[in-house]
Each structure stands twice: as structure tokens, then as C-alpha cells.
Amino acid sequence: MFDSLNIFKKPENSQLSESLDQLSKDYLSSSASKKIREAIDFADKAHEGQFRKSGEPFITHPINVGLILVSLKMDVDTVIAGLLHDVVEDCDIPLSDVKKKFGNNVSQLVDGVTKLLQLDEKMKDQSQAEHFQKMALATAEDVRVVIIKLADRLHNLKTIEHLPRDKQVKKCRETFDLYAPLAHQIGMHKMATELEDCSFKTLHPTRYKLIQDALEKNNLDKKTLISRVKRSLNAKFKKNDIEAKITGREKRVFSIYQKIKKKKFSFADIYDVFAFRVLVNNGADCYKALGLIHNIFTPITGRFKDYIAVP
């Protein structure tokens, strides 16, 4: 989802800034994009002389967080708060300076992310996961705070190889126990699966590679396949006067691993590597669409479930 932005590829700071500026212009006003550029400059000065474990200037992290938020089409205040989320905690910048420069909304979001970090540090193990989710939503007040924190966590996972192994394991388990469930809870399922996949890759690199290699061995042009299936279904539905919205995706490595583990399958037994969703207007059209789908694709015996009749 987020890799298509060419983030996490270690480009120069100016390239990251330009990418963020360009992407923000796709859906935000010119005045909003100008504020984002001002926030980048503010964060750059605040983090001057700070470096990540990779040796990169620290500013690459908040800019990447901003890129993730822009890819989610978040509002300008959320993007700015993402850019500034570490300036109060890690720099000698008072929250009042953030408020004076970028307004009350941004300062409240930045403050909320700081409080979430403090809450995170109090959580010791999985038994507190449900409590963390409740406290995170209560502490944040504004769900945008949680979204910024999830974007922050995602970029940190994408660059986690520079941490000592014990810290990698801690962060990934914490993500599985706390942050991925929190993302699911607020309806950000794509973000949740991205977090799970990154954590799984770090915790179990051999298992991840085995599944990834098996997927690539199929030599499927994924985009072409998804596009072809969608075109085929759309043509069939249009011919039969069914209005439908069709989306398709390749399932994530961790999702496939869970199925292999739960069902005790081998990879060869996993048929649903790709998932398609068909949304129609009513139940009658749903059954009609299903019949048309079965005319195109033969159902596998014993693998079909009717969640309309039996939710």
C-alpha cells in the first residue's frame, strides 16, 4: 500500500520533501500545501544535528510519516502534526511554539501523540493489550492522534533493521499486541495488515521469505490478473443489469501464514491468494451476482460459504 510512494528507499531529504509537497497538492489546497512546507522547515530546524540509528538525518522519519498520512488523504492539520510529532518530545521546542506557529488543532494533536508514547511505555505485556486500546482511544480524544501514531510505528518498522535484535523483537511483539489490534479497531484494516506483515517479516524472516518466494514463483503479474478479473466481472454484471463496485487485492504474507498455520495446510493448498470484493445494492442482486461469478469461475467443493443466509 505505502511502498508505492517510493518512501523508505533512502532518497535525499529534498526528494522526500518534494514528494510530500507534490502528493499533498493532489488533494489539498495550495495554502494547505504551503503550510506543510513550512512544517517541514520547522521540523528540519528542530531536528538539526539529530540522526537515526541508520545514520540518516532524523528529519527523514517525520517526512516519511507525513508521506504515509498524505497517502491516506489526511487533512492538513494531521499531516503537519505528523511532521512535528517528535519536536516536543525529542527537541527543546515547547508545545506553545507549535501552537503559536501552526494553531491549536496541530498543537493538540502533537500533544496527544506525546501522551500516547507515554502510555505505550507503561504497557508491559499482551495481557494489557485491551486496556491499552481503551486507554489509547480515551487519551487521544481525537482519532487522528492514533492515526499519526500508527504512521509513526509503520515507518519505524520499515527501518527497524538498524536496531539491536532485542529491540526489534520488542517493537514487533508490541505491534502485534497493541498497535495492529488498535488499527483494526478504528477500521484501518490496510494499515493493520501492513503493521502485521512488517512485524512478521522481522520476527520470522525465514517463514516470511518462504511464503514470499512461493508467491513470486507463480510468476503472476498481479496487477494484470486483478484487472482482468475485474473487467470480466464488470462486463458480466453490466450485461445482466447489476450495479456493482468491485475491488481486488493480493493477500498479505502474514494473512497467508495464519491460514497455513490454522488449517495445517501447505502453501499449495492455499487457493485464495487473491481476494475480490463485490458490493451490490441488495440481497437479491447478491445472489444473482454470485450465480454469474460461478458461471465464470468454478467454485471449489467444500470451500464455499453463504454468509448471507448464515452470517
Residue ranges with predicted function:
Residues 1-275, 280-311:
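Active-site helical microenvironments for divalent-metal-assisted chemistry
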